[in-house]
Amino acid sequence: MAYIPRLMSSLELSIESHPLLHARAFITDFPAALGTSPSPSWLISKLVTTASAPMESDDEVRSAVRELLRAGGYKPTGRGKPASEYLLRAAGENALSSINMAVDLCNAVSLHSGLPISVVDLARASGPFRIGVAKPGDSYVFN
């Protein structure tokens, strides 16, 4: 059985078991609408490759992410590469800017860890949700 944090017990989310998939999820609330709360300067300062961070992406992480995507039949190349790789390139070109607090937090973690992260607005999406490796014939929106 997959790990599901206690906070998520009321959310319909399944995380399928797969040897390459190590998914985690959490729910958070923000004190105000994201459009009215700009990201703090300390967070924006993390959106560059030279920022101090407790973790660092490396080739092993990038290879593992690509291997997982290929296991589902996805070709992580060109415009379809993992978002974490796009963030690394954009930050290196000083083209990564603030969007909102939720996205900026996840982008900063993704940039420095190399792990792809998704943000889902539960006020705009409805479950059940599934995290898993795509099966033949599945289609999905990526990036």
Features from the language model and the residues they span:
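Charge-biased, low-complexity intrinsically disordered regions
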Residues: 1-143
